[in-house]
From Swiss-Prot:
PANTHER family: GLYCINE CLEAVAGE SYSTEM H PROTEIN, GLYCINE CLEAVAGE SYSTEM H PROTEIN-RELATED. Residues 22-104 form the Lipoyl-binding domain. The keyword Lipid metabolism does not apply. The glycine cleavage system catalyzes the degradation of glycine. The H protein shuttles the methylamine group of glycine from the P protein to the T protein. Keywords: Lipoyl. The glycine cleavage system is composed of four proteins: P, T, L and H. The modification N6-lipoyllysine is found at residue 63. Belongs to the GcvH family. The gene is gcvH. One of its GO terms (cellular component) is cytosol. It comes from Oceanobacillus iheyensis (strain DSM 14371 / CIP 107618 / JCM 11309 / KCTC 3954 / HTE831). This is Glycine cleavage system H protein. Its cofactor is (R)-lipoate. One of its GO terms (biological process) is glycine decarboxylation via glycine cleavage system. InterPro entries: 2-oxoA_DH_lipoyl-BS, Biotin_lipoyl, GCV_H, GCV_H/Fam206, GCV_H_sub, Single_hybrid_motif.
Amino acid sequence: MSLPQDLLYSKEHEWVKQEDGKLRIGITDFAQDELGDIVFVELPEIGEELKVDDPFGSVESVKTVSELYAPVSGKVVEINDDLEDSPEYVNESPYEKAWMIVIEPSDEKELEELLSAENYEAFIQD
């Protein structure tokens, strides 16, 4: 299982990458592996305001549909349109090609609630 050390993680299995005051968000390798083959991804509209733990979309696999939850509050400023035509990217490249949204955070202190790679690894092994 791939677990980049430079990212932050939520207990809902989203990853967060800090980039120039914005946050790029996707689901973890662990999450995509648990879901199986992804066949559809639903994402929010650009401009949508999210609060921490709000559902912001869903991923549908051959097994189930799973909600996506905002790891931090903020405004959606970019979505990954490639996932509409290529949902399999979530399985193939969860940390690169399959990022889902970029948000401008409204409260950066919420980042302190997220897990380091080491703590996320311990969380998923429990």
